[in-house]
Amino acid sequence: VAERAGIPFVNGSSSSPALTERGLKYFFRVSPHDGQFTKLMFDFLDEFQKKKNIKISSASILHEDSAFGTDSATTQEKFINDKKYKLLNKITYNAKATSLSSEVQKLKASNADLLLPSSYTADTYLFLKTAKELDYNPKMLLAQNAGYTDPAFVSTAGKDAEGAITRSPYNDDLAKRIPNLSKVNE
């Protein structure tokens, strides 16, 4: 709509790389896209493996079926291949699903070293609840923002949130040390 009307659209949160790869004249992003975030996630994995002297050799992707989840999964798959990890699963589900039992059973059966979920808040809670019920405990969970960075995530998920690692465009810990950072984020 903004493109047709010739009105600049400043996007503060959508992270799909496709949005800036379409050649739109009036679309502007003020934060990194999933390609940049995912690169940093995999840089973190490289460092983590060195520091902890562990080896990650396999991964599974779990994502909801919107542009966010699909584009995120596509980007993650590229990095998995580039890093020579074995992709064991790439599982898509409807974000409004009322059950993730079959998806979690597949993840549990494959037992990948790394789980990369891309989910919104409600499906993040559904995944965690289902994983607990089915005793699925991924060795490492590295999430793509959204549901895992919802302000209520830790308080709502409680102990089930422990061990989840996520990327975020904003860091509250940094804001405590750099007072003006919160103003910039607003």
Regions found by a protein language model. Give the residues of each.
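Short beta->alpha junction loops
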Residues: 89-99
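Generic recognition of short, well-ordered alpha-helical segments
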Residues: 71-75, 102, 126, 179
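Hydrophobic alpha-helical
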Residues: 1-3, 98-99, 105, 110-134
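Extracellular/periplasmic ligand-binding modules, especially the Venus flytrap/periplasmic-binding
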Residues: 121-124, 173-186
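Aromatic-lined carbohydrate-recognition surfaces of secreted/lumenal glycan-active proteins
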Residues: 115, 138-141
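Extracytoplasmic ligand/sensor domains, especially the bilobed periplasmic-binding protein
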Residues: 1-90, 140-174
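Short, surface-exposed amphipathic charged segments that create phosphate/polyanion-binding patches used
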Residues: 104-108, 156-157, 179-183
